[in-house]
C-alpha cells in the first residue's frame, strides 16, 4: 500500500447511503482502498455493501445491503492518484441539511465515526488529504428550504467540519431531480416539483462559486435523474447500480484532479 493515505468521508441522504435495486456484480474489492467500520473499530475491504447502522438510525448502511457509489468513486480516485484511500461512510436517508448541523445527535454520531477512522488510519501510514463528499438535498426540496437558508446551513456545516474533522475540501455531487419525478409526492405539480429541486441545485451551484472550500465534483445527477434507465424501479427518485457507477466514476475522477 502507498504510505500516503487520503481519507474520503461520504455524507448525505439516501442516494449517498445507497438505495439500489440489488447487490452489484461483479463485486471485487477496490485495490488500495479500505472502508472503516466504527462499530468494530476496524478496516474491511471496500466492497458492496458499505456503511453500518449506528445509534438507532442516526447513520445507516446501504439499504438492504445493496449498492452505492463509494466503490466506484474510490476506484476512480485511486486510479488517478496512486494513493491509498480510507473510505468512511456516514450517511442516512431522508435527512435535511439542518439535521446534520453541529449540535444535533447526527453530527455527533458522524463525528465520532470519522474521528475514529482518522485515528485508526494513522496506524496504516501518513495521512495526507481529508475530503468530505456530499450528496444531499432531495429532502430540502421536499420541504422547500430556501436557497439562502440552504447555503447558510451548508456553509456552517462545512466550517464546523473543517475544525472538527480537519477536512481540506468539501466536494459536492450536485443533487438531481426528485420532487419533479417521484410519483408519491401529491402536494404539487411535477413542474412545481422541478422548481423546488432547482432551488437546491442553484444553492449548490452558487456556493461553489462563492466559497473556495467547496468544489463541484459532478452535475451528472441532473441528467440521470430524468432517465428511467438509471433509476431503481423499486424506489422512485433513487439511483440504480448503473447510475451509481457513473456518478462514482465521474465524481471520484474529479476529486483526484484537485
Please identify what each model-predicted range represents.
Residues 1-258:
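Cell-envelope and extracellular/periplasmic
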Amino acid at each position: 500500500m502507498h504510505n500516503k493515505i487520503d481519507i474520503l468521508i461520504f455524507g448525505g441522504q439516501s442516494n449517498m447511503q445507497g438505495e439500489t435495486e440489488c447487490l452489484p456484480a461483479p463485486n471485487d474489492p477496490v485495490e488500495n482502498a479500505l472502508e472503516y467500520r466504527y462499530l468494530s473499530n476496524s478496516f474491511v475491504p471496500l466492497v458492496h455493501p458499505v456503511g453500518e447502522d449506528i445509534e438507532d438510525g442516526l447513520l445507516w448502511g446501504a439499504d438492504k445491503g445493496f449498492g452505492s457509489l463509494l466503490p466506484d468513486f474510490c476506484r476512480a480516485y485511486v486510479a488517478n492518484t496512486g494513493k491509498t484511500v480510507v473510505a468512511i461512510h456516514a450517511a442516512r436517508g431522508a435527512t435535511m441539511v439542518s439535521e446534520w448541523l453541529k449540535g444535533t445527535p447526527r453530527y455527533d454520531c458522524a463525528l465520532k465515526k470519522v474521528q475514529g477512522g482518522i485515528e485508526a488510519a494513522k496506524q496504516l501510514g501518513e495521512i495526507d488529504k481529508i475530503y468530505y463528499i456530499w450528496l444531499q438535498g432531495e429532502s430540502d426540496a421536499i420541504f422547500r428550504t430556501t436557497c439562502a437558508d440552504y447555503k447558510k446551513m451548508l456553509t456552517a456545516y462545512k466550517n464546523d467540519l473543517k475544525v472538527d474533522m480537519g477536512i481540506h475540501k468539501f466536494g459536492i455531487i450536485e443533487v438531481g431531480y426528485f420532487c419533479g419525478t417521484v410519483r408519491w409526492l401529491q402536494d404539487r405539480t411535477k413542474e412545481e416539483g422541478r422548481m423546488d429541486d432547482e432551488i437546491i441545485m442553484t444553492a449548490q451551484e452558487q456556493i461553489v462559486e462563492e466559497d473556495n472550500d467547496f468544489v463541484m465534483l459532478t452535475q451528472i445527477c441532473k441528467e440521470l435523474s430524468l432517465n428511467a434507465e438509471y433509476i431503481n424501479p423499486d424506489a422512485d427518485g433513487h439511483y440504480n447500480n448503473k447510475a451509481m457507477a457513473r456518478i462514482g466514476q465521474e465524481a471520484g475522477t474529479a476529486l483526484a484532479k484537485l
